[in-house]
């Protein structure tokens, strides 16, 4: 099962507004064309968007996002990030009624169960998973324990070595890592860091996908960016492989 992971698209309030001299709409359009191209070569079973869809939580940005995602004609899960506004996203969903979005944020095939967990703290850049959400996640893991388990979320749980984002990562990362180790979760995917990374933690793989918008300059503690952008293709095969497509 091949899954595309998009993250940190940061669509601005209007198309002409750039973010650090980057037109995020142009990047998103390009990425969607690349996904179309990849779909002509191999089957993409699922797309997961792991947060910061819109930079300002704007309804029109969400409308653009949903229309582009629908054009890919592939089931997708959308997770919100700290830049998103849940109320506006829900308004747009109600108006647009997208066909391919998976509202449960759960997916499984014969071997894998994929789910999402909310890490957003309203009004804050850092992430935190509430006790209720941790308990619900554990319930889902136990219920689907006959599958290999993959979890996606917005905030990264392990430092990437870039202080500007490691200062606002997942605050209670230890709790979810211990939960995943307890239940032998195979994979954690996230965004937020604008810094692609892959770790192997005991028997689990953890991964931060490259941002669709821009990357932070690796190691920076001030606002310095790299204009490279991209996404990951994750092959949930017995060996589990990750291909980063960076442009």
Curated annotation (Swiss-Prot):
Catalytic class of the enzyme: hydrolase
Amino-acid positions noted as binding Fe cation 1 in the UniProt annotation, renumbered to this chain: 8, 10, 52, 194
Key words, A-Z: Hydrolase, Iron, Metal-binding, Nucleotide-binding
Binding site for Fe cation 2: 52, 82, 154, 192
Any Pfam family: Metallophos
Cofactor note as given: Binds 2 Fe(2+) ions per subunit.
EC number: 3.1.4.-
Residues that coordinate or bind AMP: 10, 52, 82-83, 194
Keyword Nucleotide-binding: yes
Keyword Metal-binding annotated: yes
GO molecular function, one term: nucleotide binding
Coiled coil: none
Cofactor(s) listed in the protein's UniProt record: Fe(2+)
Family, per entry: Belongs to the cyclic nucleotide phosphodiesterase class-III family.
PANTHER family tied to this protein: CYCLIC NUCLEOTIDE PHOSPHODIESTERASE CBUA0032-RELATED, PHOSPHOHYDROLASE
Record protein name field: Probable cyclic nucleotide phosphodiesterase XBJ1_0953
Organism: Xenorhabdus bovienii (strain SS-2004)
């Amino acid at each position: 099962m091949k899954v595309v992971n998009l993250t940190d698209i940061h669509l601005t309030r209007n198309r002409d507004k750039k973010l650090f001299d980057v037109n995020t709409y142009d990047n998103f359009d390009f990425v969607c064309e690349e996904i179309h191209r990849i779909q002509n070569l191999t089957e993409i079973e699922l797309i997961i968007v792991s947060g910061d869809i819109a930079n300002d939580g704007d309804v029109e940005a969400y409308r653009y996002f949903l229309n582009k995602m629908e054009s890919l004609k592939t089931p997708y899960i959308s997770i919100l990030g700290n830049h998103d506004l849940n109320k506006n996203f829900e308004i747009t969903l109600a108006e647009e009624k997208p066909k391919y979005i998976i509202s449960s944020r759960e997916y499984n095939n014969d071997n894998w169960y994929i789910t999402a967990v909310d890490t957003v703290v309203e009004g804050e850049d850092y992430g935190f998973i509430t006790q209720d959400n941790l308990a619900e996640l554990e319930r889902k893991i136990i219920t689907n324990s006959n599958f290999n388990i993959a979890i996606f979320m917005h905030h990264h749980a392990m430092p990437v070595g870039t202080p500007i984002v490691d200062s606002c990562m997942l605050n209670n990362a230890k709790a979810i890592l211990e939960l995943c180790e307890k239940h032998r979760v195979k994979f954690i995917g996230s965004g937020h860091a604008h810094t692609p990374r892959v770790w192997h933690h005991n028997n689990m793989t953890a991964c931060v996908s490259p941002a669709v918008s821009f990357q932070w300059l690796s190691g920076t503690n001030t606002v310095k960016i790299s204009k490279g952008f991209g996404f990951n293709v994750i092959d949930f095969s017995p060996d589990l492989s990750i291909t980063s497509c960076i442009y």
